[in-house]
Every structure is written in C-alpha cells, then in structure tokens.
C-alpha cells in the first residue's frame, strides 16, 4: 500500500473523499485543498485515470524540517534518486512556500535541484537535465513554516486537462470543477441535460463522459509516472483496457441526451470540436440561441436538468444586461420546463436572485480566486409566466411617478426628466429618463451598509425598473454617484462616443449617457434655462462654469444679442459647440472660451446684461490656483460679477450646496440685492427634492 495525496479545489474536498473511497482508496483523510489516502498500485492507477475531481495525485517521498538551506539540501538528498528515475530523463521542481530561511521559492527550487544533481553525480558520475517545460519527472516541494514535504507528481500536467479541450471561450471552467458542479446538481445520468449558455461545452462534455462511463483521463497522453522507476506498465495497461471497455459499453447503452445553446457561433464551433475529441459529439446537440429565449427541445413529459455557469460581469455597465439575462432566463425556465431541475453556478449570488426562485440547496466553491455559489432549484410542475416582483415598494412608486410625469413631460415638450429621486430611503437611487433611455444613478451607500445588501438592492432596483418601464437592457445605463475630486468630473468613464439629441422646450441638446459621470444636461436647471432664454432677448449674455453650454443655447434661441460661454474644460466646450450647431446658432456673436472661470472673472472688463453662474460647491482642481468654497467665497465672487454687470442687468446665481445661506448684509455693502427664486425653478419632477439646488436673482442696489 502506498500513501498518496490528491489535491482539489477549495470546497470540493468532501466530494473527492467520497469519489476516492468509491475507487477503492483506504484511510482517506480530508485536509484543506485535498485528501490523504492509501492505495495499492491498481487503485493508484485507477485514481489517476478515473478521478473527475482531483487536480493532481502526489506520491510523498520525504518530510523534513528546514531550519537552514543545508537542511533543505540534505532533506532532498536523503532520497536515493537513482531509484526514482534514470539520469537520461529530465526533471523539474515546483517549489511553493517560504520561511525565515528560504525566503524565495526560486532559491528553494535551486537548492533542491542541486541536491538531486549532486546525488546522481556522486553515485553514477552523471547528472540529469532540468526541463522547465514538459519534464519527464515533476517533483513538488511544499514548505510551511519549518516543515517541508517532498512529493513525486504522478499526474504530470493537472488532471483537469483531460485532453479534449484545446480551445476555450471566455472565462472557462476547469474540467474538475465542472464535474463537481454536475455531481452537485442533482442530475440523473439517464435524463436530458441542457446548458443554455454552454460556451466551449465543458459542463455538457463532462456530463456526457459520466453518462457513458468514460474515464475522464482516458484521452490523456502525458503522465508524470511514465518515467518513474516504480511504474508498472503492465498494470497500467490492464487498468486502461478495462476503462476503454467500460466506455464502449457505456456509450452503447446510454439513453441520455445533451443540449447546448450559446449566442456566439465561434464558441459553439469550439464546443463541437471539444466534443469530437472527447468522442461524445453524437450525444450533444449544440445550437446557436439566446438563453433569454430558451425553449424546451425535449419531448413533452420528459424531465431533466438545466445547468449553467452564467456570465457575472466585472464592469458596472454590464450589470443591466446581466440582470436582464438572468430575469429572462428565470421566466423562460418557469414557462417551458415544469418539473425540471435547475442548477446555476455563479460568482454573483445577487444576479442569481434575479431568477426569482427559492433554492432548495446551495454549495460553495472556488473558481480560481473567485468565491462562487451553486444553487439548485426545483421548478414547479405548473408552467408560470408570472414573475414575483422584486423591490415591490420601489416598483409601485416608479410606476406611479411614470404615469404622472410622462403626460406632464409631453405637454411641456421635454424628453428628459427625473422619474425617481431616492423617494424611499432603502432604495437610494435616482432614475432619469432621456428619451427612450433611462439612467439609474446609485448614490454611494454609507460604509455602515453591508456591501452585499447594497448590491442586492441595486440589482432589485435595476430589475424592477426594466420591468416597470418595459426596457431592453441596452436602454438602461447604470452610474454610481459619489463626490467628484479634482479632474474627475472631466475624465472619461468609457469610450463609446454614444451621443444622441434630446428636446427641451424646443431646444436640442446632445447628451451622452455612458462616457462621463454626468450626461451633458443638468435636468434640475431646466426651468432656469428657460427663464434665461426669456430674459436674454436683445441682451449680452454671459455663462460661467458653463458645462456644455445649454443655458447659452437657450439664451441664443431667446434672441440674445451675444453669448459668451466660459468653462475650463475643452471637452465640454467642444460639446457646447455641437449644441450651438444643433440649434442653428453660429457666428462671432456666440463665443466659446476655455479658461479658469474665477481667474477670467477677475481679469475681464467686459459688460453684460444677463449673467448666469452655477459654480461647483467646492473645487480644488489643479488647474485652479486656490480652492473654492461657494459658501465661503460667494461674496468675493459677487464683487467680480457686479463689476461686469451693466446697469439694469441681472445675475442668476445657482448652486447645489445644501443649507446655503446668502450673506445679504455683505451683498448690500457691495451694492447688490438678492431675491431667492428656488421654488420657481423647481419643476414637477424635482418637487420631491426641494434641496436639489438653490437659485437667486441679483441686481444692482436700487434696481430690483
């Protein structure tokens, strides 16, 4: 009997222990990442050939303490290496772990290599060669604190490499993890199995190999034991011949059928090639198709299992599409697969919640560095087309707001308006409509809120919004709103360049919902812009901190004699120029100026009749010499504005600072008066948030 160790993925140890015991292993003991066991040579070979779950199977050679690099050298040299492999064969050492003495794994591997080479040199006067790629003998040393374990890797390459998969789609599952998912799914080998997002076909191929009693490593060519002097070739041939016979018989007798769907034709071609190499292609039907439109390819009355590893998404912008995919998959399986089993493996339990089913069992496992969950569901015997709504309170409020505001917006000739603005504290988002598209802005949750809970609520909101507003996934854009720092407000978030025109009181504006944190149009200033248009006929108009120049466009359309648009961002000024062009405004009377607004204001001597200024609440941009705080600095700001304001002129001053207090006394001292008009500038869609901005009209004293 030999002492052996089988490694596996985290979370699969118990499954591996059961599998090894079924293969005849004895004295199985679970440890983190694997199972120690004892086996005779036949069981050892069967474990290598038949284990669907093991990553590698090792033959321990020695254990020793390492208090110095000499201890490592002597511990490795204690083995008579001429009895392990011949000098004509290459070897490699995989060293992992460090301690206070061996602080570098490469150094550890080098010392171990020296020990083996010196051992051969002393005994037979020759030395074997090291081969980092495809060595004949692969040795592993694991060092933990002072304890080192030295093993011969009987597998060679990892056992997940079955030999059938040369090409893979994006983010493939390792074959041994796929096998574990199938084992845990509740699938019975004589029933149909469907993967609606099959990718390169790994789950279906592994299942087909189980159904046909095919040893998972039957197609492997390279093994780590081939040049080991303890290898029994006759016994190995006996074990493999038995396996081939079992596969022939199993393939002849299986009744199981497998169905794979994917939207990517290229990946399906890979899947078909993989299935051919595994010799199970005749059992699997691969079809190009969308999981969201999944229907049942199996005869009525036959029940099987749907299994999949759906995409989970790393980028924020992909989440609406993934939420839609999971929601639509949930509807499809409930409608077309009564009485079937469903098993989904994912790195995102929040996305799985969009299926809107209660799992009867859950398992945890690692997929590389990712913490994943597998959820098993039993679908109702009664087909259902009704979805239980997530975030019901939010959905009801959104539905009510949409009904009220859509009619109002049409009457007002506006295409962009706010549908929801954190009306309910537990759903802390804003929902804005831009024509046929909708933007959800998530306000960054407090650190006290559990991250998974916040993410789950956001997913519920997205799912409910898509359902209530009947949106396709490409019509919904997700943003996270947080405090802007430095140049962040000017930096691109994406490179889509997806601009489209929207209408506001007859003015046309280009908006971009994806590339920047903001969209190009501040919706809460809509009425203020309209007022500026009405105030500017025949007047010289100045727009400071102008953003994309929408207020200037309204002034121009309102008949302004001239418009001057000042902003520090070249990007936004180019955007403003497009807005002018979209409205037929051109000529030297419409100036666009790139400048630090505060610096420009302090240096300019021009005169204007109407001035609009909407400064940031706070700014410490590197392109500004000093910091700016709107509460602290608004009087200094007004001093400069007064100098540029003609007699009889008006300043419209707006800002977003909550609790802003105008210093009327200081204003009077510089010869200005101010009247708050905030309530007049709040339109119906912002009536629920009266602190979205504050707005003032200022005039020279005695002219109000």
Curated annotation (Swiss-Prot):
Q: Which residues form the THUMP domain?
A: 43-154
State the UniProt keywords alphabetically. Answer: Cytoplasm, Methyltransferase, RNA-binding, rRNA processing, S-adenosyl-L-methionine, Transferase
Superkingdom per UniProt? Bacteria
Catalysis: reaction(s): guanosine(2445) in 23S rRNA + S-adenosyl-L-methionine = N(2)-methylguanosine(2445) in 23S rRNA + S-adenosyl-L-homocysteine + H(+); guanosine(2069) in 23S rRNA + S-adenosyl-L-methionine = N(2)-methylguanosine(2069) in 23S rRNA + S-adenosyl-L-homocysteine + H(+)
**InterPro entries xrefs:** 23SrRNA_methyltr_KL (IPR017244), DNA_methylase_N6_adenine_CS (IPR002052), RlmKL-like_Mtase (IPR000241), RlmKL-like_Mtase_CS (IPR053943), RlmL_1st (IPR054170), SAM-dep_methyl-trfase (IPR019614), SAM-dependent_MTases_sf (IPR029063), THUMP_dom (IPR004114)
List, alphabetically, the PANTHER family matched: RIBOSOMAL RNA LARGE SUBUNIT METHYLTRANSFERASE K/L (PTHR47313), RIBOSOMAL RNA LARGE SUBUNIT METHYLTRANSFERASE K_L (PTHR47313:SF1)
Q: Which NCBIfam families match?
A: PRK11783.1
Q: What is the similarity comment for this entry? A: Belongs to the methyltransferase superfamily. RlmKL family.
Protein name in the entry: Ribosomal RNA large subunit methyltransferase K/L
Q: What organism does this protein naturally occur in?
A: Proteus mirabilis (strain HI4320)
Taxonomy of origin reads: Bacteria, Pseudomonadati, Pseudomonadota, Gammaproteobacteria, Enterobacterales
Quote the gene name from the UniProt entry.
Answer: rlmL
